[in-house]
Amino acid sequence: MRIFYLLSILPFIGGFTIHSSVSPQPSTFTPLNIYNGTPGGRLNRDLRATLPINELKGNPPSEGCPILNLHRCKNPSMYDKNDNIQMLSNPIQKTRGFLKLIRYKNILPTLLLTTTGGFLQTQSITQLLKSTSFLASSMITVCIMASSMILNDLFDIHVDKINNANRPLVTGEVHPQEAVTYAALLLLFAECLTRYLPQQMQMVANWAIVNIVLYTPLLKRIPLVKNISCATIVAFSLYFAGKSATSSVATSPLLYVAAHTVFFGSLHNELLLDIRDIEGDVKNHIRTVPGLFGKTVAWSLAAIGMVYNVVKISTALSVQYSPAPFVLAMSPIFYHLYQIRRQHYSSAVIKKAVDFTNVPLLLSLLYFCKISIS
């Protein structure tokens, strides 16, 4: 049953590879068309003879090159087998490309989120490590996170050529068909792992899979909805792991507090990243809050969200705990928001602020864990 469920959503992914063998090949850069020929990546024999020659290795190719990050072949009739083809088939190169594609640096923060959720619910690391359902939920969360990154890059190749030109699908380190295969395998593995979850959490996992499949082609095109959807998935990973760690129906109040904090932290980051990427989004007709209403409106929403979160959580904590450590941990975020406005929404300042946001969030989660066992 789970396999049929997964197959029902794969057409959204497989749409990248569906094409007609008799229809003319497109000339634009699309997920199907990095090589301007067949999706399998092999160049047309007629096309090979027309490729321009660039003797300088390492230079980015000029417009019209079917491979985006490799230097031109010395012989216009074929690729240098010792250079380009070897790079394409090199397992180490492919592994690096895959790790970049899934944004592997997010794996550790993701596991920290799931561990925090599990600990807030059980107050025991030992119990977590012995819980098959918790371990399965953590693996499912990582797989969903990784596959969402792949799907995002597949749909946004045009945008990444402007905003993130070093992404592996843009540089050619990973071919779109390979990316589709990676995403499908990750989702299949995640779906198989749901059998180890409590019954109610299995439906939650299925909902998350559907959400990330629909996110980039549908939800991401709706201003603010896409920001809320992304923040919800991130925050819900913590709640999902916590509820999977135990069969208890009761939910720790601190689990709600932590999920609330992570949600607004993620929403803050999403809005700031939209400000940073406004140029590419506007050129590619992607509707975002800063693109439609201006950078100031997007910045204001991010700031208001963080103020609301700090006030709401501080009020909730003050009933039984001291909110001072939480407020202190979150305060640097407001300093960075001030710097973003002061520096006229500089991309470098925004990147620094987004990267730093993880520190206050981590400190807040550690504080929640501490008071959960006090």
Model-predicted segments: where are they?
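N-terminal chloroplast transit peptides
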Residues: 1-35, 49
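Multi-pass alpha-helical membrane architecture of UbiA-family
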Residues: 19, 29-31, 35-374
